[in-house]
Amino acid sequence: TPPCSGRFAPSPTGALHAGSLVAALASWLDARAHGGRWLVRIEDIDTPRCSTQAQHTIMRQLEQHALLPDAAPVLQSHRTALYQSALRQLLQHRLAYPCTCSRKQIAAALANAGNAPERHAGLIYPGTCRPALPSLNTSTQASTDDIATFDFATQAHTAWRLHIAACLQRQGIAEPSHITRWSDRSLGAQQQCVAHTAGDFVLRRADGLWAYQLAVVVDDAAQGITHIVRGADLADNTPRQIVLQQALGLPTPQYLHTPLVCTASGEKLSKQTGAAPLPEGHNSQSNRTQALANLQAAALVLGLPPSSANSPARALQQWVAAWVGKWCKNEALL
């Protein structure tokens, strides 16, 4: 059994807020409760929205709250070779394909088929550019030489999508409406038909940026992440990531999706909903006092008792045992 590894993976689009501190605290406590390591990954693949200043601010905030990673943080923007290799692997087995459809064209195709999405709902790709499934009697492997030398950057305005039906066929599943099932340590038994709910999702965007789903799956495997602890708003990403893990021959971690911090109107607290940066003190003593107060509030969201400690580091140690009792009791059922 591999040693436990957890991670916190913020996007450097701004400072940490109360909601992101809950995610950081939960992942840190879970790693420590399992005697494992805790890593920080800076998810900066959406480069136009990210900044180095925000990255430095995030790391400083984590240090103020005694949430110290066990290795230097890695940046997704430095890992494009890994993502290219994964996409080439999928292409070699005909599990991915190019798509030149714009969002407007996808919406029009859905409307023509009577499947127009509800307002604010995501567009489920109708398969306009999807190639036919390869015959089971013929080779399903593309030319290795052609794939190895292929330059994705030369394909302007072209996205690359996962061929879900081909992924299922490769596993011996002929029915495209196959249900992906998994067990969440908080939410319990979960299931989703990825083909119907998400469709052939994007792996590399038409603007040349790598998609979140591919990057997170590749990085979790490369970093040996065994326990993923994150907010409940990300739970619906899990089945897509499991399908992609299976297509790439990668292990599937354990998942725990934790409660969210919400606004007064019930929306998830985020930068988009006006979340303020974590409050700080004006000197080292007031900084420590404020950090402890921030952690106490985050622990409350996670159902943990108040800590009597007088420092962030001591409070964290007190909460490890409480975390085991609250969040690790269902692991034997997985």
Where are these regions (language model features)?
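Residues that form generic nucleotide/phosphate-binding pockets
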Residues: 61, 86, 109, 128, ...
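N-terminal Rossmann-like or analogous alpha/beta NTP/dinucleotide-binding catalytic cores
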Residues: 1-118, 232-233, 237-250, 308-314
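Short, Lys/Arg-enriched charge-dense amphipathic segments
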Residues: 59-69, 89-103, 118-137, 146-149, ...
